[in-house]
């Protein structure tokens, strides 16, 4: 390891760094880091993900030689700073201090202290958190602060739009169809005394499988729309620290009984609920006592994600100066992504200036000083913290935007049922505008999950027999998303453009309209203008970049926008294998400018009217053969073209051949005509021969 050493990927550095640690018999930990995903998300860059970090600092923390389970931290000034250089497109060691100072430095085998290559510029606070010995000591449920009490027994919004009996019937049909087409899915809703929807809970079979795989931690995300309806999304965390939705619940009013019923339904749907060890909630969640009662073996903790977003919101709304905002943003970033006692203490002191006394006291008691919370956060790995925060940003933004943009609760429910499995897609994938089919294929080796009957809860639970679900198959089309009322006006808009504009203008605008129809629209007012963002449907691109599931690539066999985006991310050029033969210059001699097979051996006699129809059929057949041939590649394409030419020459009228065709023409002999396109073994491949065409 030398100052200025460069590495193409993080794996290359890791291999060299491992050899260095083995040689010096010293251990290093990450003290400070900025991941590529975090940097790309916040700065709009597209750095390669295989470099893993834009900047990372390793400090020496060598383990004692007595091999005890506990580690003693040596206060050693040795460190290494690895940074990414965009110009070089390489990771390089920008700072290096090899001055190891240990209690047993003579036996450490490290580099002598008299040969430092750099000077330690500054001393960062230790990353280790002071963890209490007894982490299993249960905390008594605290009294909810006043900023949470306004959500307890909150009356329903008088401006809420009631659901008519016809809408209730539509919801019932949609949920029955949802249960029919997705075996293992579950749903339940209750109707109040006013015959209005009080609560709706549902989850797909994929969500059930996700919770069964990762039941240890549960996070509740709360969204409220303009009409006062409440949506709760239940999320779990997989081993890569990516958040996944496992349950949805919609409440007309957030009261203690409705929340208790919602949580009880979740436990009924998921038999692995006793495995939940921790439940993370928003700081404003007012029903912690109910949550503790239904999950008695789980600890209720404040979500790091939601508390961080709360502090960011408070900072944005405050009137403090720009310098303080910048310093607190940096302190918040260090506390979350480089957690340590010092960083948490610094953030706590700055938050005291920003927050009111009650909220600050609540966060100080349940977030800043919660050793179990930060111990778990650090234990799972600070390097994966970016993944955790980014995945929550993606999932919660999808859920919140879809729930808040709908005008009615009925439309909202219909959209969530249709898009239920699109919330757990990797990356920022859009929700398709067209209603997707809920039918799914199940592997033959996977047994179908036991089906729970659909329930409508009124004064008491009424269970519908499963046989009744079959009656709704004929009406399943009606239970899909209702067609927009202004569909005719949209079609009329295109008709007017077609009538008043040129053909080219209409075609170009129609292409844009197709993009709009296959996208999710994020529209927000930004001052005097409107910010519009289109999120297109996701498509599957092969790793070699030769194929994509989009219609453009399937039709033209050219690199589409999705393949080009993949190549741009990996900084690779377009390869020859990504372009179909019909677009390559070296195969253009096989086609004429009109895209038809070139064959100068036949000149149609247009003076004979009775043969004009035959000539048209020949042209059509020629175009079709050209399209079929150009779907093949390389030698196979040349072989098939040579075979077709040979057949045409045999069938051609000798009197119609021009003088130029009387000359010998070279063909590749591929065998007897009945087996012209058969695959021959290499040993049986015939030699090249000359075929003479005589008059």
From Swiss-Prot:
Residues 475-489 have a biased composition (Low complexity). One of its GO terms (molecular function) is zinc ion binding. A zinc finger (SWIM-type) spans 530-571. InterPro entries: Zinc_finger_SWIM, Znf_SWIM, ZSWIM1-3_helical, ZSWIM1-3_RNaseH-like, ZSWIM1/3_C, ZSWIM3_N. Residues 434-490 are annotated as: Disordered. Pfam families: SWIM, ZSWIM1-3_C, ZSWIM1-3_helical, ZSWIM1-3_RNaseH-like, ZSWIM3_N. Keywords: Metal-binding, Zinc, Zinc-finger. It comes from the Eukaryota. This is Zinc finger SWIM domain-containing protein 3. It comes from Mus musculus. The gene is Zswim3.
């Amino acid at each position: 390891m030398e100052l200025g050493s460069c590495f193409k990927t993080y794996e290359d550095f890791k291999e060299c760094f491992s050899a260095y640690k083995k040689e010096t018999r010293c251990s290093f930990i990450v003290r400070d880091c900025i991941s590529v995903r975090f940097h790309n998300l916040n700065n709009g860059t597209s750095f390669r993900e295989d470099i893993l970090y834009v900047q990372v600092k390793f400090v020496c923390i060598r383990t004692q030689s007595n091999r005890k389970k506990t580690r003693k931290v040596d206060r050693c000034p040795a460190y290494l700073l690895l940074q990414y250089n965009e110009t070089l497109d390489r990771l390089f060691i920008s700072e290096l201090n090899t001055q190891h100072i240990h209690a047993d430095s003579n036996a450490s085998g490290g580099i002598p202290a008299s040969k430092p290559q750099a000077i330690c510029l500054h001393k960062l606070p230790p990353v280790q958190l002071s963890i209490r010995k007894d982490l299993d000591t249960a905390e008594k449920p605290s009294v909810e602060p006043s900023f949470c009490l306004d959500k307890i027994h909150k009356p329903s919004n008088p401006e809420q739009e009631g659901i008519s009996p016809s809408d209730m019937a539509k919801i019932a049909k949609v949920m029955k169809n949802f249960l029919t087409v997705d075996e293992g899915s579950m749903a339940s809703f209750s109707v109040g005394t006013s015959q209005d929807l009080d609560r709706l809970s549902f989850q797909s079979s994929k969500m059930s499988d996700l919770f069964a795989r990762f039941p240890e931690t549960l996070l509740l995300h709360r969204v409220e729309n303009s009409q006062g309806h409440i949506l709760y999304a239940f999320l779990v965390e997989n081993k890569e620290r990516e958040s996944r939705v496992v349950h949805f619940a919609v409440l007309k009013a957030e009261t203690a009984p409705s929340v208790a019923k919602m949580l009880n339904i979740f436990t009924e749907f998921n038999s692995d609920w006793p495995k939940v060890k921790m439940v993370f909630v928003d700081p404003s969640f007012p029903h912690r006592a109910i949550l503790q009662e239904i999950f008695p073996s789980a600890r209720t903790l404040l979500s790091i994600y939601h508390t961080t977003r709360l502090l960011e919101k408070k900072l944005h709304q405050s009137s403090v100066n720009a310098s303080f905002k910048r310093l607190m943003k940096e302190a918040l970033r260090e506390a979350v992504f480089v957690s340590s006692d010092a960083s948490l203490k610094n953030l706590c002191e700055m938050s005291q200036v920003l927050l009111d006394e009650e909220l600050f006291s609540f966060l100080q008691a349940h977030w800043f000083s919660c050793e179990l919370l930060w111990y778990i956060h650090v234990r799972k790995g600070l390097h994966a913290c970016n993944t955790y925060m980014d995945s929550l940003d993606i999932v919660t933004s999808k859920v919140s935007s879809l729930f808040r943009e709908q005008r009615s609760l009925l439309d909202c429910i219909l959209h969530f049922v249709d898009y239920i499995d699109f919330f757990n897609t990797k990356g920022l994938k859009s929700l398709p505008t067209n209603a997707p089919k809920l039918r799914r294929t199940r592997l033959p080796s996977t047994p179908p999950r036991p089906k729970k009957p659909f329930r409508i809860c009124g004064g008491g639970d009424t269970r519908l027999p499963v046989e009744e679900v079959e009656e709704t198959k004929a009406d399943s089309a009606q239970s899909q998303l209702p067609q927009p009322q202004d569909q005719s006006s949209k079609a009329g808009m295109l008709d007017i453009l077609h009538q008043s504009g040129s053909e080219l203008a209409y075609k170009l605008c129609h292409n844009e309209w197709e993009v709009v129809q296959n996208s999710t629209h994020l529209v927000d007012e930004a001052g005097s203008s409107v910010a519009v963002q289109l999120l297109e449907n996701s498509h599957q691109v092969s790793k070699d970049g030769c194929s994509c599931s989009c219609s453009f690539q399937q039709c033209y066999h050219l690199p589409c926008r999705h393949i080009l985006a993949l190549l741009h991310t990996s900084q690779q050029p377009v390869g020859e294998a990504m372009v179909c033969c019909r677009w390559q210059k070296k195969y253009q001699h096989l086609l004429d400018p009109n895209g038809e097979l070139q064959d100068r051996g036949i000149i149609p006699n247009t003076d004979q009217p009775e043969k004009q129809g035959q000539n048209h059929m020949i042209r059509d057949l020629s175009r079709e053969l050209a399209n079929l041939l150009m779907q093949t590649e390389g030698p196979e394409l040349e072989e098939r073209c040579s075979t077709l030419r040979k057949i045409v020459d045999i069938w051609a009228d000798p009197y119609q051949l021009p003088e130029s065709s009387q000359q010998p023409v070279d063909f590749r002999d591929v065998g007897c005509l009945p087996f012209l396109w058969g695959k021959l073994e290499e040993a049986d491949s015939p030699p090249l021969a000359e075929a003479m065409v005589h008059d």
